[in-house]
Every structure is written in C-alpha cells, then in structure tokens.
C-alpha cells in the first residue's frame, strides 16, 4: 500500500479542522463527523483547542482512500504557532491549502503558499465555504492568480452550490489542453505535430506537473455541508505521490512529543527509509546513545494500533523514551526538506506564579512544555531573577497561561510583552585584567579584544594564545565565559554581531584552574563592552502590502509613521503593491488595521528579516540598580588608572 504524508494548512477560520474531520468521516475512519462548534473533533484533541476553536499543536491522524494510506497532519493556522508549522513542512509529501471562499486570501495564506512554493511541496488549493452568502468566486480566482500563482488549474465549476469536474481522465476542455501545453514541452510538441493526445495523456501530465510543484490544482467545497469532500479525497490520492525509497537502512525523524494524562512521554516519528521494529536497538543522532523499542504503534484509520513493524514513509509512535527530543533522528541521518529559515521569537515577557512558593512548579511545567515545543524558550534573568518566556505573539501567551492553569494547576501572572532587542559593540576595544592585581581574586590574566561585525554576522570567537602555552581546557573555559557573557549586555539584551579575540593570558601553574579563567572572563568582557559602548538593534520585518489604489496615500502615511523603509511601490488602476522593511515594534497590529481600512481587501504580509540599529526608543532588560560588587570594584580600579 502506498503511504503519503499530507499537511492541511490554512489561515485562521478558513475551516481547516472541519475539512479534516470531513475527510476522516468520508473515508470511514470515524463513525460521525466531528464539529468544532460541538468540541468533538478528533484532530483538535486538547481541551483548549476545542474551547477556542483553534489548532495549537500539529496533530496526526490517518485515512485510507483509493488504496492509499494518507497520514494527515493538521497544523495550526495562527502565526503565533509558526514554529509548529515549520516543523511539519519538513516531513510532507504534499499539502492542501484551504481558503475561505468569503474571506479569500489572507496574509497567512500568502505566507504559507510562498513557503510551499519555495520548498516545491506539491499543493492542492481547496476553496472552502462556497455555501456562504456573498461569495464572489470570479473575484477570488483573480486574487488567487494575482497573489498566489498563475500556475493554477481550476478543476471544477460551481453551479448552485454543487461542484462539477471540467478536467478528468476521460474529459478535458480545450482551454485546459492549452494550459497543459504551456507547461509541458513534450505535450506541446505532440500538440503542434497534430499527434493524437488522449484525455488520459493530459491527465497524467497534470499529475506529473503537480508532483513537481509546477501546477496547483484548485478544488471547491463546503465542509459544513460535506460538499466536494469525496472529490478532494480523489485529488489527494491522485496528485500527491509517495517518495521513492532510497535505502533499506533505518532513518527516522522525530517531529512531535506529547505527554498523556498519566505523564507518559509519547514520541512521533516519520520513518524516512527502512523500517522500525519492536525490540529493535537503535542509535540516536549518530551518538553513543542507543535505545530499545519496547512498544510500537502506528495510526490507522483515525486510531492508534499496536504493531510489530512500521515501514517507510509511515508514522511510528513510541512511549517513555526519556532521551528523545524533537528534531532527533534514529539510524541514518534523514534527508529532509531543506530551505526553511527558522523564525526565532522576537517578543518576551516575565511570568511569575500567583503564589511565590509555586515557582519551582512553574519551572517544571515550562520545561515540560519546552520538551513538547522547543520554540518555547524560557530563562531566568541573571539580574532580576525573573522567569522570562520568549513569544511569537499575544495568542501564544494566552495559550501558555491557560495550559499552566488547567494542565499543571498553577496560576501565573504575565507582565507586559516586550520586544526582544539585541546589542552590538560600537568600536574596537581591548581590555586586560592582570593576575594578582587587586581587586582580581582569580589566578588568571585575561585580555580580550572586541570589535563590531556586520549586522547578521553573529558571534565569532578567536584566540591568539597558543595551545602550547595555555592548554585546551583553559582556553575552552574562556570561550564558555565569552558565550555566557554575550547572553546579557549593558542593557540586558543578547550581544551579537561581534568578534571576540582572546589576546593575552597568564597563569600560575600550581594554583590556576580553568574555573579561574571561566569566572574572570565575564568581567573582562563587561569592561570592554562598557569602553566600546553598544548600539541597540531591533527586530525588522520584511513586508509586502497589497491594497486598493484608493487607499495608497493612507498606507504610505502609515508606513512613514512606523519608520519603515519603502523599497518598491508599483500601482495600476486598481491595486498598489508596496515592499520594504518595518520595525516589529511599530507594526505589531498593522495587519488588522489594513484589513479594517480596506474592508478586508488589503493584505499585509510580513516575515522576519534580521535586526538593524534602532531609530526609536527601547526598553532595558535589566534592573540597573542591581550591580555586581566585584564588577563595581573593577570599574572603580580602572577609573583610577
């Protein structure tokens, strides 16, 4: 049996989960069709998902149709959970991108499609909610061609709420023949030579073009009234093809971890090549760690079943492997989809329990959530001792707060969300702290040179000290101290885009230890950074704004107020397209503003595009009155020289 892994993607409220539930019901995987409104869906299984009607975590289920097993991954539709969506992309053989016939293309739709297109993932576009009043399909078709791709093939016509095929194995309209000829040279040559080309020939060519992500079929339906669902199932099993197996050697990718109500850790793996068997002993990540598979499940027709073996391209579930982390692999390193640029969160806020004695409980709960979602990073501020969580947005914060209260029984308070800034030294400086020169309490001399690098270069560490003089353990201790120091600069933000060179060292053989060097390094680094001064860097977004031409003046005024850098403006009689960069801090709510002043016609699409020196104010991430006493003594001694 062929097996495919299919992602279901959509902007929020396009009906993604409803479509998935109908696929399960139509294929016979469930006895009744779950409804989001009723809170009885299979894929949105978390209480918070059912209550709020949104998908928070990617969920996997399975159906069989036309002799093909299709593992369906229902992904979040909200931008705050983009990291979950990005992990899903790595394991897909194809995707269904769902649009709402009424709301049309949203910013999230365009972002998702551009990623699918970039990664060359075969994609079917499904226009849902065709039953809604006021639907204008002709305008939507134009929007699809303008904002998504010209290479779309509308496979059906809609008449009085019903769908009818216009292209199949046995019949194809003349204009569709021309479309295929324009996309395939072999068919074009046969067409120009007046050779006989059957509808099946055209159909098979369309299948090949979709598999290469050169053409995107468009279908219609209504999940609410089960319209077009069987046709969508037929299209999925026709156009989305399983990958060819390249090896019999086991290669598996861990894409999801969850904990059941009893606390058992459940790990979901996609078997890329080979097979995973019960009682196998397998290696993790080419390391020296081995695990034994003591239990093994897969997903079949919407439910989990115990099995002895899971084969290539299928989903395996194992329990209680504590060493597992998302992104791990078993056996050979898998060849996954490349080209994803992971988006790091650019917001953060402090969190504290309502009852101070429950702080350790909060930390334990956050650690569990981090295991399930590595994009949820949290830390303890070294100056304020506060717990800080990095976030993608307000909705994610609300979900985390609800999970802490309902799943872990701990109530917390979140402070105001802050933008995550960064720091970069302004000029090249050198700083030395000598051994046995007060107030230095460590048996070490360290000299460091700091110099700024171009934006986006990150941290570079070099050493001018030979390993013949100072061995690896001592120098590694200095490097560790540098990395630790970069976590918090003069204003409490990460220090980046700099080169740090270890330039001078002295030690006393009988008493000096690597710990002396590790502990002294942050003081040398801090004094050097103070001498250099820092630029504050703020996160930037690359944006594309599409608006009706009549709204262009307001849009440009808004962008100027947000201190954006406009790179290109192109307008015709109806539309204006504006591209550029804008600070995250000034544009957080602009997508909803665009939707409001254009009455739903405008699209404001953004993606992270690095950091630049801020032109606006910023907030510190440090309580400036809390000073390290030894640092104060170093500063005082340096000022006396």
From Swiss-Prot:
Residues 1-244 form the tr-type G domain. GTP binds at residues 10-17, 74-78, 128-131. Keywords: Antibiotic resistance, GTP-binding, Nucleotide-binding, Protein biosynthesis. SMART domains: EFG_C (SM00838), EFG_IV (SM00889). The keyword Disulfide bond does not apply. CDD domains: Tet_C, Tet_II, Tet_III, Tet_like_IV, TetM_like. The keyword Nucleotide-binding applies. Abolishes the inhibitory effect of tetracyclin on protein synthesis by a non-covalent modification of the ribosomes. Belongs to the TRAFAC class translation factor GTPase superfamily. Classic translation factor GTPase family. TetM/TetO subfamily. This is Tetracycline resistance protein TetQ.
